[in-house]
């Protein structure tokens, strides 16, 4: 095949093969390429630009809430990792080890960080002495390594980018508040920036983070009916501070253990954007996260005045949106398909007749709606339209989620829904891990969360018939 192969190629229809559709999108929209190391990915400029926008929005929120950025080493001594027993057991199967430096065998193995709790704890134990040193609210942007057996770009890779917040507080109440506050930051970001509706809730004992007192999550539903854990926030209580001896003198000069949290989101958010909003023509990017919000395509650009007018419009629109002119020598139809593939929210077409009529053709990526807009109105029309597109995409995603959320009152009903209707299943649970494991065995689903907004569907556990303690969202998940 020619190296100059056509950019715009047919995408496998999502209803035919969702996994292949997803792979086609990430490749053909030029988000990633596969790396030489199995399970790793090269994030290309367009994919990385989306991640940069995610970073920009979240980093601003973190700083507004009093957090500071730091950077920890990527290597963790084995002895440090083993200080918190539950934590090391939870990550042991995924850890990559460094055993040799140059030609010398290391005296102690070094773990390539799968997460950095132990490093932050070791640091906090050295710098926290007094109640005046608290709270400590740190965040780190970095990559982590988890030796995954099955990988897929953005969703599960051996190395991935993320942020991890780690905080230390004087009281249990403060750490509990921090955990929920940061979960709310994530939930608001998903809905107000990514146009992805989420369900907030607590993970079960079985599904919580290794070493945590409690784990909270935001869960979203993909187009194929599978759930995606889109962000987590963990309350450690004093579990880690006791293991690492992180103590401070309180106002009465009494030694107390700190209470800690950690919370994070990863590049899997890009996977969520693809799988919630994408269609058979490619990406469909929410305007607030799109690297390019408006593309101007000149029509008959060889004719006098067309490119000059396109550039004039670009300069005006640049005051209110991220915009570019595509003045390449490719055919307009090719450009239309390319920017649909890349999910650019708004396309403007401008040619000799449009200039004569002082108008442009405006096409929305989300609905394919085509309208004529006066050139004089673009600076006010574009921001309004971008907000309208965001709201429309959020509502569309929420409708899809709600239409694929089912309620089960009996085990037979639960199994039938799990077998025939992809989506969330709401059902009551007694709180026993044995019932949770049985539901996974008989229906192939996992508990996604115990939502903060509880409902009493019945008063009996869907599995054993004993008294129910929680309503749980269940589903198949990435």
Swiss-Prot record:
Recorded GO MF terms: ATP binding; catalytic activity, acting on a protein; proline-tRNA ligase activity; transferase activity
GO terms (BP aspect): prolyl-tRNA aminoacylation
InterPro entries: aa-tRNA-synt_IIb, aa-tRNA-synth_II, aa-tRNA-synth_II/BPL/LPL, Anticodon-bd, Anticodon-bd_dom_sf, Pro-tRNA-ligase_IIa, Pro-tRNA-ligase_IIa_arc-type, Pro-tRNA_ligase_II_C
Pfam families: HGTP_anticodon (PF03129), ProRS-C_1 (PF09180), tRNA-synt_2b (PF00587)
Gene Ontology CC terms, in alphabetical order: aminoacyl-tRNA synthetase multienzyme complex; cytoplasm
Compartment list: Cytoplasm
Record key words, sorted: Aminoacyl-tRNA synthetase, ATP-binding, Cytoplasm, Ligase, Nucleotide-binding, Protein biosynthesis
Similarity-based family: Belongs to the class-II aminoacyl-tRNA synthetase family. ProS type 3 subfamily.
Function, in words: Catalyzes the attachment of proline to tRNA(Pro) in a two-step reaction: proline is first activated by ATP to form Pro-AMP and then transferred to the acceptor end of tRNA(Pro).
Protein name: Proline--tRNA ligase
Originating organism: Clostridium novyi (strain NT)
């Amino acid at each position: 095949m020619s190296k100059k192969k056509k950019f715009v190629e047919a995408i496998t229809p999502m209803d035919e093969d969702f996994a292949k559709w997803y792979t086609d999108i990430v490749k053909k929209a030029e988000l990633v390429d596969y790396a030489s190391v199995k399970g790793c990915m090269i994030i290309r400029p367009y994919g990385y630009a989306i991640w940069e926008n995610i970073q920009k929005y979240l980093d601003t929120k973190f700083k507004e809430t009093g957090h500071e950025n730091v950077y920890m080493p990527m290597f963790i001594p084995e002895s440090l990792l083993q200080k918190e027993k539950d934590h090391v057991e939870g990550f042991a199967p995924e850890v990559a080890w460094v055993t040799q430096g140059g030609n010398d065998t290391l005296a102690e193995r070094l773990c390539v960080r799968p997460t950095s709790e132990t490093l932050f704890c070791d640091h906090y134990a050295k710098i926290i002495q007094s109640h005046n040193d608290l709270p400590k609210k740190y965040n780190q942007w970095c990559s982590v390594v988890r030796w995954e057996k099955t990988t897929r770009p953005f969703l599960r890779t051996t190395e991935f980018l993320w942020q991890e917040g780690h905080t230390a507080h004087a009281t249990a109440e403060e750490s509990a508040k921090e955990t929920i506050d940061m979960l709310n930051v994530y939930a608001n970001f998903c809905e107000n920036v990514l146009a992805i509706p989420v369900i907030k809730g607590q993970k079960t004992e079985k599904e919580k983070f290794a070493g945590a007192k409690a784990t909270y999550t935001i869960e979203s539903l993909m187009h194929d009916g599978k759930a995606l854990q889109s962000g987590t926030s963990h309350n450690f209580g004093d579990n880690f501070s006791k293991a690492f001896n992180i103590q401070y003198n309180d106002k009465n000069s009494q030694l107390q253990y700190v209470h800690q949290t950690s919370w994070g989101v990863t590049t899997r958010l890009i996977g969520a954007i693809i799988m919630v909003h994408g269609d058979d023509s490619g990406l469909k990017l929410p305007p607030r996260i799109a690297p390019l919000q408006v593309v101007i395509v000149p029509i008959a650009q060889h004719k006098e005045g067309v490119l000059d007018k396109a550039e004039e419009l670009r300069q005006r629109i640049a005051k209110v949106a991220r915009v570019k002119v595509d003045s390449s020598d490719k055919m307009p139809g090719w450009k239309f398909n390319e920017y649909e593939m890349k999910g650019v929210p708004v396309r403007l077409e401008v040619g000799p007749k449009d200039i004569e009529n002082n108008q442009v053709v405006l096409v929305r990526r989300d609905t394919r709606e085509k309208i004529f807009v006066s050139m004089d109105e673009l600076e006010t029309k574009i921001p309004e339209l971008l907000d309208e597109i965001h709201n429309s995409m959020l509502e569309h995603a929420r409708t899809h989620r709600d239409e694929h959320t089912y309620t089960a009152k009996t085990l037979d009903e639960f199994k039938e829904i799990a077998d025939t209707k992809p989506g969330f299943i709401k059902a009551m649970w007694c709180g026993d891990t044995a019932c949770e494991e049985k539901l996974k065995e008989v229906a192939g689903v996992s508990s996604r969360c115990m939502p903060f907004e509880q409902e009493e569907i019945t008063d009996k556990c869907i599995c054993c018939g004993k008294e129910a303690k929680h309503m749980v969202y269940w589903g198949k998940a990435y």
